[in-house]
């Protein structure tokens, strides 16, 4: 039966009518154990989901819906390597990358465990050489800077992790990331670097990704201006790829190619050799801790009862708001500056996975799927868009993420940070009533018409849902668990919505059209092969590119 016509869906629609007008503050007043009822801890991660518009009955109905989806079977299929990415005929086995030694798994006749172990050993040996200074550049100097050139999952994950774990870096290497094909990204990154002491990681599964190869070729040209001899490329460029021929053609020693597999999706690839920049920056042992943390969350996801399962709970709360409250975006607010790239990382993880409009049978869905994910670190976010969260017309569920321990204890800074995090979750839940606002204005000396005019602007409706995820400390193990928590949340939602969370065909169309437009910039005659708007834009750029002056706008006469 179609999801939106199932008995479980209908029960939630009916329940929404009963609970949608209830105020969370009243639910807390009538249930002194509400926090204990709606919170749980796993290792060093605590999830408080009590500030949601839910009751025990809500959670029962949500768990009925997730059971209807066959989540336990789908979960087993993913972990056992079945081809759940059916549009690309691929297994989904990023979880295999973080399993400890000793397991066995065979996919298409290949010993997955052995292959993963071999690549990890290769990464470990390489990291040891570079960090110790044994690996030297073409002039005999040790490497001081590592530049990762990749895009999408080859950039977002490693960049986020290296930023998040800066306090755990060994300090012998600086790491930089280039992703955008905009030449400014490469130029500004290379400014001040020394070709003699710079190592480039070219991260591209096929070694044909347009943006990555453009940046790699330009980086090589920059390097050769000083190095001169193309033979020196092998000492300063390594690859994470599966295309040995293209890697060797570029000038990279195939012994310095770190492989990964088609069962590793880009947005899940930081656990693979794509994480080489992480391992170089932190040291391989720290990278192993990151993997161990993710594996711990994998085990929790596999074994915890649905009602006590963090990814399941987060996933179903998201569905509750997206599909029944019509809340089609979610804010991720880490109260930790080291996590400043975490919202951007989650954008790809969530929106590329679940931004789908057809179900697994190819039919258009009649319900919302993946929400818009956005966010910034607190407290910066408070001074940017919290106005909308508190008093806007849209309900935006929020995930707050905060660490109890600061890596940089300075005065009362961390106390202030944590106080703001907890205060925002309380404020979004409680709001401010007319009586409270009136009393505040009267205490400030306002009365009569002035008070009445200002009063509506001082009201906060409250009843805005939030989760608060509390880490004991942001360290490699806990970050690994946090990332895996969101990975599995996204997977569960995709299963419930009956979509394929592991392909990304929506990325392709624009890339195809860009390949057609690029040679048209060199056309002799005006371009007329597109719609009128696109033709005009192309021809305008061609005029500028060819050094012609633009015609003056008639509007200029107005000034």
UniProtKB/Swiss-Prot annotation:
Q: Keywords of this protein's UniProt record, alphabetized?
A: Cytoplasm, Gluconeogenesis, Glycolysis, Isomerase
Q: Name one GO biological process term.
A: gluconeogenesis
Q: EC number(s) in its UniProt entry?
A: 5.3.1.9
Q: Which residues form the active site?
A: 352, 383, 511
InterPro entries in UniProt: G6P_Isomerase, G6P_Isomerase_C, Phosphoglucose_isomerase_CS, SIS_dom_sf, SIS_PGI_1, SIS_PGI_2
Q: Which GO terms describe its cellular component?
A: cytosol
State its location(s). Cytoplasm
A Gene Ontology molecular function term for this protein is: glucose-6-phosphate isomerase activity
Q: Which Gene3D superfamilies match?
A: 1.10.1390.10, Glucose-6-phosphate isomerase like protein, domain 1 (3.40.50.10490)
Q: Which reaction does it catalyse?
A: alpha-D-glucose 6-phosphate = beta-D-fructose 6-phosphate
Major localization listed first in the record, in broad terms: cytoplasm
Q: In which pathway does it act?
A: Carbohydrate biosynthesis; gluconeogenesis; Carbohydrate degradation; glycolysis; D-glyceraldehyde 3-phosphate and glycerone phosphate from D-glucose: step 2/4
User: Enzyme class, one word?
Assistant: isomerase
Q: What does this protein do?
A: Catalyzes the reversible isomerization of glucose-6-phosphate to fructose-6-phosphate.
What the record says about family reads: Belongs to the GPI family.
UniProt xrefs under PANTHER family = GLUCOSE-6-PHOSPHATE ISOMERASE
This one is known as: Glucose-6-phosphate isomerase
Organism equals Chlorobaculum tepidum (strain ATCC 49652 / DSM 12025 / NBRC 103806 / TLS)
């Amino acid at each position: 039966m179609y999801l939106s016509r199932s008995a479980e869906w209908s029960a939630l629609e009916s329940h929404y009518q009963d609970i949608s007008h209830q105020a969370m503050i009243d639910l807390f007043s009538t249930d002194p154990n509400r926090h204990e009822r709606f919170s749980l801890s796993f290792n060093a991660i605590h999830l408080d989901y009590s500030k949601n518009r839910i009751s025990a009955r809500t959670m029962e109905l949500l768990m009925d819906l997730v059971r209807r989806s066959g989540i336990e079977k789908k979960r087993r299929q993913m972990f056992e390597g079945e081809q759940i990415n059916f549009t690309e005929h691929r297994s989904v086995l990023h979880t295999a990358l973080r399993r400890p030694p000793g397991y066995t798994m065979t996919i298409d006749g290949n010993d997955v465990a052995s292959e993963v172990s071999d690549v990890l050993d290769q990464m470990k040996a390489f990291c040891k050489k570079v960090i110790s200074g044994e690996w030297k550049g073409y002039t005999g100097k040790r490497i001081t800077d590592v530049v990762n050139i990749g895009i999408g999952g080859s950039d977002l994950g490693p960049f986020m992790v290296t930023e998040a774990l800066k306090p755990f870096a060994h300090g012998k290497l600086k790491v930089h990331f280039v992703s955008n094909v905009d030449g400014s990204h490469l130029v500004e990154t290379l400014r001040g670097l020394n070709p003699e002491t710079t190592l480039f990681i070219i991260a591209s599964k096929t070694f044909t990704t347009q943006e990555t190869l453009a940046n790699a070729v330009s980086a090589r040209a920059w390097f050769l201006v000083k190095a001169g001899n193309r033979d020196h490329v092998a000492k300063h460029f390594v690859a994470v790829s599966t295309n040995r021929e293209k890697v060797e053609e570029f000038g990279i020693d195939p012994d310095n190619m770190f492989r990964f597999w088609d069962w590793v999706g880009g947005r899940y690839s930081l656990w693979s050799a794509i994480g080489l920049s992480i391992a170089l920056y932190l040291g391989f042992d720290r990278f192993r801790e990151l993997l161990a943390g993710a594996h711990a969350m994998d085990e929790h996801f596999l074994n915890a009862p649905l009602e006590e399962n963090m990814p399941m709970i987060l996933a179903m709360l998201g569905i509750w708001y997206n599909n029944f409250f019509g809340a089609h975006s979610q804010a991720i607010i880490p109260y930790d500056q080291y996590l400043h790239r975490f919202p951007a990382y989650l954008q790809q993880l969530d929106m590329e996975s679940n931004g789908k409009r057809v179900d697994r049978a190819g039919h258009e869905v009649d319900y919302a799927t993946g929400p818009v994910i956005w966010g910034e670190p607190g407290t910066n976010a408070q001074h940017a868009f919290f106005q909308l969260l508190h008093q806007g017309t849209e309900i935006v569920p929020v995930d707050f993420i905060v660490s109890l321990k600061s890596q940089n204890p300075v005065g009362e800074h961390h106390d202030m940070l944590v106080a703001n995090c907890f205060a925002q979750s309380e404020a979004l839940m409680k709001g401010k009533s007319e009586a409270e606002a009136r009393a505040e204005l009267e205490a400030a000396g306002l009365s009569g018409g002035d008070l009445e005019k200002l009063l509506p602007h001082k009201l906060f409706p409250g009843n805005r849902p939030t989760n608060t995820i509390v880490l004991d400390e942001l360290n490699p193990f806990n970050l690994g668990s946090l990332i895996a928590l969101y990975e599995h949340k996204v997977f569960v939602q995709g299963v419930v919505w009956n979509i394929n969370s592991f392909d990304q065909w929506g990325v392709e169309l624009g890339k195809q059209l860009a390949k057609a437009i690029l040679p048209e910039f060199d056309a002799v005659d005006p371009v007329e092969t597109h719609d009128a708007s696109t033709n005009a834009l192309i021809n305008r750029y061609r005029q500028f590119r060819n050094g012609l002056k633009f015609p003056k706008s008639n509007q200029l006469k107005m000034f």
